[in-house]
Amino acid sequence: MKCPRCGKQEIRVLESRSAEGGQSVRRRRECMSCGYRFTTYERIEFMPIMVIKRDGSRESFNRNKILQGVMRACQKTQVSVKQMEELVNEIEEKLQLEDVQEVTTLRIGEMVLERLQRLSEVAYVRFASVYRKFQGIKDFVTELEQLERLETHLRRDLERPLRNSPPSESESTASPDWVGGIPQLLDQNDTSSNLSEIPK
């Protein structure tokens, strides 16, 4: 390996360690001639994947291109560089495990959005605005509404086991309306009950 500064080949390794979740080895190197220090990464060589672009043309899968797009979307957010790299690693690993030879930019974009949604709403909307080519504020509002609906469904899925789980002994004693794990509504014939107080 040649020194990127002086071009000499007398290089020594100062430090080696696992990186990118075990997907690569990071090595810190030093040129013995000029003293310049630099970092290299050794990665597993996966089978090449071709990316089908919107216009039908094809190009080789480039993880750095995806990472740059994610970094732009995550500017001034709390998402760390490590989290961004892990996001791209996860996408690349998933595609390799699926043993696909071709993948569309549409599929890659959706995979990125799915993961950004868990990291940052701001980054999600930024990436979506470029990926889905927003034309105006209406597109942003539509995307935000869709994101809100998704989060609502996720919260309901997380809360459902809690609502359906049987009550503890103390809850059973304190709440006589609970029968068989299902809360009983007030008697519909009870005209004294306030309908606004019935949980919806």
Curated annotation (Swiss-Prot):
GO MF terms held by the record: ATP binding; DNA binding; zinc ion binding
The ATP-cone domain, residue ranges: 49-139
Disordered: annotated span: 158-200
Zinc fingers (unnamed) by residue: 3-34
Keywords from the UniProt entry: ATP-binding, DNA-binding, Metal-binding, Nucleotide-binding, Repressor, Transcription, Transcription regulation, Zinc, Zinc-finger
Compositionally biased tracts (Polar residues): 186-200
Top-level division of the source organism's lineage: Bacteria
Keyword ATP-binding: yes
GO terms for biological process, alphabetical: negative regulation of DNA-templated transcription
InterPro entries: ATP-cone_dom, NrdR-like_N, RNR_NrdR-like
Binding note for cofactor: Binds 1 zinc ion.
Listed cofactors: Zn(2+)
Statement: the UniProt record of this protein carries the keyword Cell membrane: no
PANTHER family: TRANSCRIPTIONAL REPRESSOR NRDR (PTHR30455:SF2)
Function: Negatively regulates transcription of bacterial ribonucleotide reductase nrd genes and operons by binding to NrdR-boxes.
Family: Belongs to the NrdR family.
Protein name, entry field: Transcriptional repressor NrdR
Organism name: Synechococcus sp. (strain JA-3-3Ab)
Lineage summary: Bacteria, Bacillati, Cyanobacteriota, Cyanophyceae, Synechococcales
Gene designation per UniProt: nrdR
